[in-house]
Amino acid sequence: METRGTTGEETISYWFDLPIDVAEFEEKLGVGAESGDYRIIEKVLAFANEVHEHTSVYQLNELDFMYRQLSSDMQEEYVSLLTVFENLEALYICRNVIIVYPDCKSMIDVARQKLMNDPMFKHLSEDCQEYYFDFEAYASHLQEHGKFLVTEHGIFELPE
């Protein structure tokens, strides 16, 4: 961040880690957090696309809070998830209804995992499940009737 100096005033720059302590911010830069007399000149953030030169300290802290509330799987695949969600806030709002299948590489893996977690099928042996259950058909059904995002590190089941 740096201050916006008027003619003849010195420009002060300082690097802050998030979340930004407002009192420290005001002390280091000598301007109020609500003043708008500062601008963001550099940033290293996962959600950098959400931050602009005139983003306020309060907005930065709010974005940081939302990002930290995402699961580690969602943070790792944040860029991929933004292909489906409009922005960080939209992802944050839906974070508790997104189901993550971190060890799944295909929809067949998701079908297997869903079956293993279903109480009606839990008592069946794996051999029995393999023999009687068509995982490929179930995977196709899931894909046709659900919304999934396949990433390098797993599969996300998204709300409709």
Residue ranges of predicted features:
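N-terminal ordered "arm"
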Residues: 1-35
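Acidic, proline/glycine-rich low-complexity IDRs
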Residues: 112-160
